[in-house]
Swiss-Prot record:
It catalyses: L-seryl-[EGF-like domain protein] + UDP-alpha-D-glucose = 3-O-(beta-D-glucosyl)-L-seryl-[EGF-like domain protein] + UDP + H(+); L-seryl-[EGF-like domain protein] + UDP-alpha-D-xylose = 3-O-(beta-D-xylosyl)-L-seryl-[EGF-like domain protein] + UDP + H(+). GO terms for biological process: protein O-linked glycosylation via serine. This is Protein O-glucosyltransferase 2. The keyword RNA-binding does not apply. PANTHER family: KDEL LYS-ASP-GLU-LEU CONTAINING - RELATED (PTHR12203), PROTEIN O-GLUCOSYLTRANSFERASE 2 (PTHR12203:SF21). N-glycosylated.
Amino acid sequence: MFGTLLLYCFFLATVPALAETGGERQLSPEKSEIWGPGLKADVVLPARYFYIQAVDTSGNKFTSSPGEKVFQVKVSAPEEQFTRVGVQVLDRKDGSFIVRYRMYASYKNLKVEIKFQGQHVAKSPYILKGPVYHENCDCPLQDSAAWLREMNCPETIAQIQRDLAHFPAVDPEKIAVEIPKRFGQRQSLCHYTLKDNKVYIKTHGEHVGFRIFMDAILLSLTRKVKMPDVELFVNLGDWPLEKKKSNSNIHPIFSWCGSTDSKDIVMPTYDLTDSVLETMGRVSLDMMSVQANTGPPWESKNSTAVWRGRDSRKERLELVKLSRKHPELIDAAFTNFFFFKHDENLYGPIVKHISFFDFFKHKYQINIDGTVAAYRLPYLLVGDSVVLKQDSIYYEHFYNELQPWKHYIPVKSNLSDLLEKLKWAKDHDEEAKKIAKAGQEFARNNLMGDDIFCYYFKLFQEYANLQVSEPQIREGMKRVEPQTEDDLFPCTCHRKKTKDEL
């Protein structure tokens, strides 16, 4: 999984810093800026990251790439002969870089060096003092308030407040009986209890394979911080479940997708969550990799809208028909047929998948629902194309913070104004570019790995505060076993419980 990464623990500068307009421009290692959570020992993420902003000798920030490999980055543990860390430097093409590194063992006093032509950049070297734990190290911080501060989590999250407002009190005893009776036969559910920072589960329904995503984030959280004792039900299906119009006797169900006609409690999607947990692991598409693969600059992008996907909604059929009528405006095609009969005369041939990064060769990205919300929206936003988003009853955990005409161009749910909106974007190129930039900034600032961990913890913490009785390890529950520790690189947790914590 990480063999290639481990062979190259730093990148050498081989490309000179050139002017953005063609002439020579001097990059200043002293004036360039470095910041981010990956420089804090206590911020444990699957892949830690920080930023570099290139600045010239006049104090002006670069706004385009000074060269892909101008910075040398090395991560090492001075007390160790070999540091088991994978490092990547990602050029965001706007004068800034993301440096991300995944640790496969825990170390003391980790040293992070950033150099330009042999000179240290900003305040390099950075020393992460004390123990620095890797993702698989089971060493939770007992003080959750301290963890929230280190992670720079927000005090409140509006979507969590909205979702939990339906439930002034939660009785674990009651829901443990009623939810399986109401939903357990027809739906796929997981009944979880977190007790003493251990995770227990009982599944309901036939298709419960997606529990792996929920198991993974819960275990990851318990390795990092003392979780509140909490008992909850997670919906593994696509559609939200709690559709009662009245608030009387509704049940709290946690889902990856919400809707305006349901009262489910929304979590970050399994797709986005998995991309965070597996960054620099088994996934290649994540919120950081997209930022280094945004295609040509805006002025050089193809001026057609692009879409690929399967036939999981009627409006997608209409989109492909529109594309066939207006190929100069829209490049939309199906990669798979499953829900509807494939009529090649109407919808054209099935095409091969293209790399997600190739979407960003186009200025305009169409985001249209599948069975529920299209879970690709975070990745589309963090690119540098403008998103045309279909109006929808479905939403992910962050949709309500997005503003139409600021972060994306809205399109009616039946796509009746899609051509009009595309023509507007073509006629208002600078405004469309500004919307693309605002959407990208929103995603950069709100949908990174630390944001996802904060959301989950705050959600479970605030939900736990609503409980009117103690969560229990119910009959039939089994412990979700933690990941087996690597015997070659064992993790020694240096956090000792005080008497007050015992």
